[in-house]
Curated annotation (Swiss-Prot):
Keywords: Signal. Belongs to the UPF0412 family. Residues 1-23 form the signal peptide. Pfam families: DUF2541. This is UPF0412 protein YaaI. It comes from the Bacteria. NCBIfam families: PRK10154.1 (NF007541).
Length: 134
């Protein structure tokens, strides 16, 4: 129960950061607290439906191991797409851009992004920052 509250608090913190803008239309979509045990239902919901063409992932605090990620679009069919994410991200490291909306339909908006993974080499929970580019 405590880890659920911690994850919920982290998601709310991530939503508060979602309006922060960077150069070149890069926006922090949110921050996810990564538990120490493998978890496959870590969800980052976008507060508003947003068209995002690609994302970057940053390990803000601690090392992270990822076993998968998917992006979900707001459509009548609830379309989703599996993402090719690196298996590990070291603290302070940022991935290259990961393309989404690759089916030539750049008008689909992202409703949520889910991750499977956990914190490694740390007694504290790592933070995964998700940066979007529209």
């Amino acid at each position: 129960m405590r880890s659920v509250l911690t994850i919920s608090a982290s998601l709310l913190f991530g939503l508060a950061l979602s309006s922060v803008a960077h150069a070149n239309d890069h926006k922090i979509l949110g921050v996810i607290a990564m538990p120490r045990n493998e978890t496959n239902d870590l969800t980052l919901k976008t507060p508003v439906c947003r068209i995002v063409k690609r994302i970057q992932l940053t390990a803000d605090h601690g090392d992270i191991e990822l076993s998968g990620a998917s992006v979900y679009f707001k459509t009548a069919r609830s379309a989703s797409q599996s993402l090719n994410v690196p298996s590990s991200i070291k603290e302070g490291q940022t991935t290259g851009w990961i393309n989404i909306n690759s089916d030539n339909d750049n008008k689909r908006c992202v409703s949520k992004i889910t991750f499977s993974g956990h914190t490694v080499n740390s007694s504290d929970m790592a933070r995964l920052k998700v940066i979007g580019d529209d």
